[in-house]
């Protein structure tokens, strides 16, 4: 088993190995399948953004389409929740906001070379 490591510096948290390669591949496959069915959006159309600023393509996973994504992303969401709860407990975010946090929507974003600095963004 690969060791999970955490580094928080100036409120930027790096959680290595919390999301496995297998979980990443499931998210990518889900995105690609949803893109084939035209269930993704781009920010040029959605936000009326200039092609020079935003060109990425996104899939939004939420309660309205949980039947599409939950089984594929369940283990990733558990690990994301572990990392997120560690972060809010160790940065003062829980006290700063004063209300419980809830996941409402997961965005899987594909950004190609020259479109930004991420290849994949969750």
Residue ranges of predicted features:
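Non-heme Fe(II)/2-oxoglutarate
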Residues: 2-100
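Conserved short histidine dyad/triad with adjacent acidic residue
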Residues: 108-122
